Amino acid sequence: MRRVTDSRADEVALNRALWAVVNERFTDAAADELWARPDAVWGLFEVPERELGVFGEVAGLDVLELASGSAYVSAWLARMGARPVAADLSGEQLATARRLQRRLGPVFPLVQCDGERLPLADGCVDLVVSEHGAAAWCDPQRWLPEVARLLRPGGRLVFLTNSHLSALTVPPEEGVAGEALLRGYAEAYRVRWPGGGVEFHPSHGDWVRLLRVSGFVVEALHELFAPPDRADHPFYEIVSPQWASRWPAEELWVARRA
């Protein structure tokens, strides 16, 4: 059985504790509206999937939502005809997902596990999706090879994460991204926040290299801006809509397993 290093195990435990708090303060209450949405959206400012088209035709596909949180993306995909499995580190967030499955449906498997070590068989899925999950909270040198193991040949990986530029300009203590660079280019690769939690924000070059060595071919990178008239996010202090109207708030990557 593979083991994680003590330092990484400590980071995973720290992230698990952080997301228990976040679920209590925000994600549990927010999940009802997200599960009930008729159409899929992406990111802090809810960019419609119909404008991006990154899912493609998912009916009949086996899908893994990695670091799923309350699994609302899996709910959207299930309604589109996919067969999702949602996996997350946080038992609290998966409890929220179960509550919404009972209240709204649909029902699909929920798995509590580390996104860097998944208890699933090789070649078991056609599509892996992660919306602000694995890309920020898991070590890319661990989770990308794991996803490659799970995907069938030609399967796709679609993941959303904070933009590298936002990671360079978010203050270390509190507040949203500004116009000054507060970290060196490589310093954002691994960020340990004072309030708890360890995030990963590789540069574009890092992502391309990491994806290639894990057996992926990059198909697209969508840089997401805030649409006009968007309000501040009700909970996450990352970027303001004013900032995100000028610079990309998030990056949506699409890659295919070779």
Describe the function of each predicted region.
Residues 156-189:
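Conserved class I S-adenosyl-L-methionine
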Residues 127-141:
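A short SAM/SAH-binding and catalytic strip from SAM-dependent methyltransferases
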Residues 116-127:
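A short acidic, Gly/Pro-enriched loop at the edge of an enzyme's catalytic core
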Residues 1-33:
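N-terminal, positively charged/glycine-rich alpha-helical extensions of SAM-dependent methyltransferases
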Residues 32-61:
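Conserved alpha-helix/loop element of class I SAM-dependent methyltransferases that forms part
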Residues 62-117:
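Class I SAM-dependent methyltransferase SAM/SAH-binding core
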Residues 141-156:
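A short glycine-rich, Lys/Arg-flanked "PGG" loop and its adjoining helix->strand segment in the class I
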Residues 198-221:
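Short alpha-helix
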